[in-house]
From Swiss-Prot:
This is Phosphate import ATP-binding protein PstB. The keyword Oxidoreductase does not apply. It catalyses: phosphate(out) + ATP + H2O = ADP + 2 phosphate(in) + H(+). It is found in: Cell inner membrane.
Length: 259
């Protein structure tokens, strides 16, 4: 397919002719698209279409599994992440990820946030405390945990744990934040808080979200990509994708006739 371009501005992430394999299985086929900076881009599509796989390629999580490989280009500010010789840990500091299930570390709320910061920066105690508070405020969690920072992160509710994970991700000040179905295990109230947070975060970060909830994609995202069986079927402004899709396959999925 041709490269999907949605804006004339320079993209934060440019994917060019990306193919991905699980062993011999061809999971992503010739994906090309440009993800705009300081916007929320949502990936939708049926289970197994390649949404989460693509997300994991963005910060090379797949390299943890030797049978998986990627071919093509993923450019972050013009640098191909797939061939970069930089430390992968530094890459993942720039391209943070929050997973479907909340994964607080087995440590205090404070240390959950401070852990990553200590890996990449040498801050004095005051600056570290300020960074932790800043991240928790950004994640709309400070007011709920400021008096119990020494308690275990696992003591929080599911929605609070997910916001803790988001705070942990942004504490190291990444440029891109990847969210893999961040609300799938949460109740409606917690989901609403996460959605509000996603909308606010784009002022500081480029946000990419995978979701099965099409209403969530419509509410939160500026751009939407529809994927099916490893192919990028359509990519454009969210309003256009939902109300004036150019492909029948996209319309069928969004209207519930397929999926």
């Amino acid at each position: 397919m041709n490269t999907a371009v949605v804006t004339n501005a320079a993209p934060k992430i440019a994917v060019k002719n990306l193919n991905f394999f699980y062993g011999k299985f061809h999971a992503l086929r010739d994906i090309s698209l440009e993800i705009p900076e300081h916007k929320v881009t949502a990936f939708i599509g049926p289970s197994g279409c390649g949404k989460s796989t693509l997300l994991r390629v963005f910060n090379r999580m797949f390299e943890l599994y030797p049978e998986q490989r990627a071919e093509g280009e993923i450019l972050l500010d013009g640098e191909n992440l797939l061939t970069s010789k930089k430390d992968v840990a530094l890459l993942r500091a720039k391209v943070g990820m929050v997973f479907q299930k909340p994964t607080p570390f087995p440590m205090s709320i404070f240390d959950n946030i401070a852990f990553g910061v200590k890996l990449f920066e040498s801050l004095n105690t005051t600056d570290l405390e300020e960074r932790v508070e800043w991240a928790l405020r950004k994640a709309a969690l400070w007011g709920e945990v400021k008096d119990k920072l020494t308690q275990s992160g696992s003591s929080l509710s599911g929605g609070q744990q997910q916001r803790l994970c988001i705070a942990r991700g942004i504490a190291i000040k990444p440029e891109v934040l990847l969210l893999d179905e961040p609300c799938s295990a949460l109740d409606p109230i917690s989901t609403g808080k996460i959605e509000e947070l996603i909308t606010e975060l784009k002022s500081d970060y480029t946000v990419v979200i995978v979701t099965h909830n099409m209403q969530q994609a419509a509410r939160c995202s500026d751009y939407t990509a529809y994927m099916y069986l490893g192919d990028l079927m359509e990519f454009g402004a969210t309003e256009q994708i939902f109300f004036k899709p150019t492909r029948k396959e996209t319309e069928d999925y969004i209207t519930g006739r397929f999926g």
